[in-house]
Structures are given as C-alpha cells and as structure tokens.
Amino acid sequence: MKKKKKIMILIILLLIFIPILYSLNTKNPPGTNVSSDFKDADCKFLYDLTYLKDGKRIHEHEIFKRELETIKNAEKFLMIDFFLYNDEYDKSMDFPNQVEEMTDLLVAKKKENPDMPILFVTDPINNFYGAYEEDNLKKLRENGIDVVVTDLNKMRDSNPLLSGGYRAYVKWFGTSGGGWIRNFFDKDADKVNIRSILKLANFKGNHRKVVISEKEALVASANPHDPSAYHSNVALVFRGKAMEDLIKSESIFFDKLPDAIENFKAEEVTSPYKLKVITEGKIYDEISKNIKETKKGDEINLGIFYLSEFRILRELGEAAERGVDVKIIADLNKDAFGLEKNGSPNRPALSELKEDYPDINIRWYQTSGEQFHTKFIYFKFKDKNPLAILGSANYTRRNLDNYN
C-alpha cells in the first residue's frame, strides 16, 4: 500500500513539474528579437496630447489621422498590426468611433482594389481569447481582408507555474463557445467562458502598433481602440530601406507573403536621420546600451506609461549618479478605461527610484480619465548626435525580456 502511495505521489509530482520544466524552456518563434542596421530615413515625429488648459480639456491628436491617410494613399499593399482593435467599453462613457472608421476605410479600400493585399494582424484580447469573434474583425475578414489573430501558444511563457499547467491540461479544450462570466471590457458584450479567462491569465500579448504601405511605414505607441482615443501617445512615420526591415519583422505572422509585399523594395533616401528597427529583447539592449554610454553633462528624457523593468530603473539611477540629467514624465497608472487603478507599477517603482537616487527629476503627467500612454526615450549627448527610441513597448519585463 505504501509503495502504491509513493508511486501515486510521484505521478502527481511529475504531472505538475514536467509541464513547468517545459514552460521554462519555451522561446519566441524565429524572426522575433530583431535589431537591424541603421539606415537613412525620411522621418516625421507624430504625437497625441490630451491636457487641461484654463479648465478645458484639449486634444492635440495627429496619429490616428495619419494612419487613415496612410491607408487611403496605399496602392500596392497594406500590412497592419494592432494590439487593441475593438469598440468594447462601458457605453455610459463616450469615445470617438475610431475602430469603425478604420474598418470601414479598409473595407472600402479592398472593394476599390480587390487585388491589393491587405494583411491585418491583431491580438486575441480583442476576441476575448477566442470566446467570440469581435464584430470589426469579422467584418474585415468577411470582406476579403486577411486577418491573423496572433497565436499566443507559440510565444515564450512568462509565468511557467501557470502556463505549464495551461499548456498541458487546458489549451486542448479551446476557448470558443458561450460562457457565464461577465465580459471585463463591456458589460453588454457577450459573456465569456472560464477557458478564455485561463488563457488571459497567461499574460501574453502581441503589443505592436504598426501600419505599412508601399509609400511609408508608421510605428506608434497608440492603439486605434475606441477607449484609447484620448490617450497621449507618440509615433514615427518614415520612408526608406528600413521599411523592408519592418516588413520582415511582421512577416513572422504569415506562412507566405503576397508577391507585392515579398518583392517590395523600398526607395533609397538620403537623409540626416538614420533609423533602425528593434523588437522584443533588442529594445532593452538598445535602451540599456545608450543609458550606459551617457556621461556627466548628457541628458536623458523619458516619457513612459509603464516603467518597472528593474535593470532600466537601476541603470537610470546609476546614470544620475554619474552626473547625467535624468528627467522622467510618467503616467500615474490611476485610470484604465473607466476603472480606477492603484498606481502600480509606476508609483511604487518610481517612488523607490527617487528615494534611492534623489537627483532624478520625476514628474507625473496630469490625466483626467485618459492615460499618458507614451513609450519614448531621448538621449542628448554632448559629444555625439542625439538618439531617440520610441514605439510600442512598455518598459516592463514582459515587453523587454522576450515575452511579448
């Protein structure tokens, strides 16, 4: 009897620990974690700002307008990748119908030119991880647009304790089908099932925000998602050979690209600006390298939505100790689409940073329901050209350590 009990315990332990060991060894697919070479590029910086002036809420917004313009002007192809693309929210609040507007424009574009490939990549959060199909994504698909929902099972696990068990014992049942749990994003939307909640709990995502045509490419911190319409954000629109590198980084979502995209050669440009494409862990490498290269008299200006990556926090502190002028503007992390948050991660992380390194100048962006959703760092060096890093990645472990 004791022998049987030991065997049973051993089997249970194996059933627990083998999936965890497997999860610990997962990796992101080939083609991620990219760092291209610097290339000449015609660039334009775009921004969205929401702020209060004389008691009035002011919106200075450029990014969504330029995305629509890029779509309108495309003649040969479009590649689009957005993390949040839905119009689900508490309808007691009021937001512009951005997703509907972009969806209608893409459908019209496809009808106008049926042979032009339009590839649209998004994250399964919009379908609540497979519980249902979001209406706008369904409309795109039904009108001949190639919609790819990122397969998060192919991504590296950030929480092996949970993800190991999920991979071994839950994912095989799928996530489609009705449920009884209220939708977190919209109380009037379809209810979701426990399997989709468990998939959400893996905390994975395709966090990119990219629009590419044969004429220009745009990388942003902004989602077109309706409840994100008033957030403050940054973007860069550019032309040049770096467009090919961005296309290559997006090609990982497709078995085969249409010929118009596969054979695309961007026009060479001559410009005082040089640009490189970086993704996943290479973003951290580039940020870290430039922070470490700063010297007394240099400046670091950081505008950020989430900052909790402990290596970056330490490196910023060490830069301040070297006499680098470090300025940070951060979101208070108190608002999320009508819900009140507790200030995590920024308030505790930056409060501790200020306590340990008093010379760092930290300001909180004053929001009124929206978010300071920016992901932007600017280095002003005394002895070489300035450098900016901006895009879709928050400064968190998941975004910068090859998880998302």
What do the PLM-derived regions correspond to, one by one?
Residues 2-64, 72, 89-93, 100-216, ...:
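PLD/PLD-like phosphodiesterase catalytic module centered on the HKD motif
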Residues 70-79, 284-299, 318-320:
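Secondary-structure "cap/kink" motif recognition
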Residues 78, 82, 110, 144, ...:
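Sec/Tat-exported extracytoplasmic proteins
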Residues 79-91:
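Nucleotide-activated donor-dependent transferases that construct or modify glycoconjugates
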Residues 218-246, 387-404:
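Segments surrounding the PLD/"HKD" phosphodiesterase catalytic module and close analogs
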Residues 241-287:
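Active-site cores of enzymes that catalyze phosphoryl transfer or operate on phosphate-rich substrates
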Residues 265, 271-278, 286-289, 311-328:
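Extracytoplasmic/luminal low-complexity segments enriched in Pro/Gly and acidic/polar residues
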Residues 302-307:
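Long, repeat-rich segments with strong aromatic
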